[in-house]
Every structure is written in structure tokens, then in C-alpha cells.
Amino acid sequence: DNNRSSQENRVKNNRLAYAGAWKKFKRFFTFFGERLVQPTNHYSRKRQYSRTYGYALIILATVMSAFVTTHLIHSLIGQYQLFADISILPSLTSTPNYIWMFIRFILFYAVFYLGFPSVSYGLKHVFQKRQHVFNYWLTQYEGMNVLAIVLLAVATVMTFISPVWLFVGILIVFFAHILLYIVTFTSSMFKSATESTIDPIYLSLIGLVVQLIITISLLLILF
């Protein structure tokens, strides 16, 4: 009887765990769909969605970007080596360690994607006197980047299909998603424009320059 009762409790707990996980999963995709349709729409409540959604979107973007970049480099080097073997092009004496390259791109993109909201948060705190809770604000901020995540997913699928033949298309989609991140950053400066001590255009320029310095510094350090 004790064993049967214990087994029934485990089954019940497992069902509750699955139901809870499914509910969280469903809420995330509800958030994702709403932000895709209306990226800048205000929430009905300030903390309507989980404070972890922003981090989840950054992780998704980081992993997909690292994969796309590493796989493109791997495919292009392989294609060059193939042409070098059948032509007078010089052969490569060595090839990169792609696992280590992927890890470095993970670090690079993690800081890159977190840099945009962090710089925006700092500027809004200092110049616009906004007192946000960072984790919840990050969810709202990254919600405006859902379309960029979709474009990045498209680039990832294209990379799976044919990174060489679809190279130009992949680059176009990939850089389009980066442009959307820049648009989101600029938009975040204008949302509190009436409370700013500095014109939001100049705030945006300051923030983008800071982000550019961070990006170039990371590239020099990691690569």
C-alpha cells in the first residue's frame, strides 16, 4: 500500500510538473506572439510577463548567431580549400578550431546582445531619471526585438540548408536583424523623451557609440 501510494504521488507530481512547464511554455509563446504583432505596445500591467523572458530571448539570439557565424566561416573555408585543391590557389596550412571559435562567438554575442539594453538602461537611468527594475525592463525591451529573433531564426534555417549557395541571402537577413536591434535601441530612447535632459537623438548616438566601442573591443580581445 505504501509503495502504491508513493507511486501515485510521483505520478501526480510529474503531471503537475508537466502542466506547470507547459503553462510557462505557453505563456512565453503568447508573449512572443503579442510582441511580434505589436512590438512597442504597452503592457496592461507593469510586470505582466516573467522577468526571465528577456534573458531567454538573449540566449536564443546568442546561440543562433554563434551557430550562423561559425558555420558560415567553416563552410567558406571548406569551399576555398576545395577550389585550392583543383586550382592554383594557395592551400591553407591550418584551419581554425571550430569548437573554440563557437565558444568565443557565444561570449561575443552574449555581451553584444546584452550590451544594447544595458547601455539603454544606463542612459535612461542617468539622463531620463527612469527607475526601472532591470530584469522586468529587459523583458519589455527584448520584446521589441522579437521580429529580429524571427529573422535570425530564418538565417539559421538558411544556414542549415546551404550556407554557401544562400550566403548572400543569409548575410542580408542577418544584418537586417542587427538593424532591428539598432532601431529598438533608438526607440527606447524616445519612449521617455519628454523627461530627458538631453535630446533623445543625441542620447541614441551616445549609446550607439558606446555599443560600437564595446563591440570593437570584444572583437580585438576574442579574435
Language-model features, listed with the residues they occupy:
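N-terminal juxtamembrane cytosolic/stromal segments of multi-pass membrane proteins
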Residues: 1-63
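Juxtamembrane loop-helix boundary motifs flanking transmembrane segments in multi-pass membrane proteins
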Residues: 13, 17-20, 24-31, 35, ...
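Perimembrane loop-to-helix junctions flanking transmembrane segments
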Residues: 39, 78-98
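Alpha-helical transmembrane segments of multipass membrane proteins
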Residues: 61-65, 69, 112, 116, ...
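Membrane-helix interface motif
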Residues: 68-85, 222-223
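Alpha-helical transmembrane segments with an aromatic anchor "belt"
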Residues: 89-154
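Hydrophobic alpha-helical transmembrane segments and adjacent short intramembrane/lumenal linkers
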Residues: 127-210
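Juxtamembrane boundary at the C-terminal end of a transmembrane helix
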Residues: 213-223
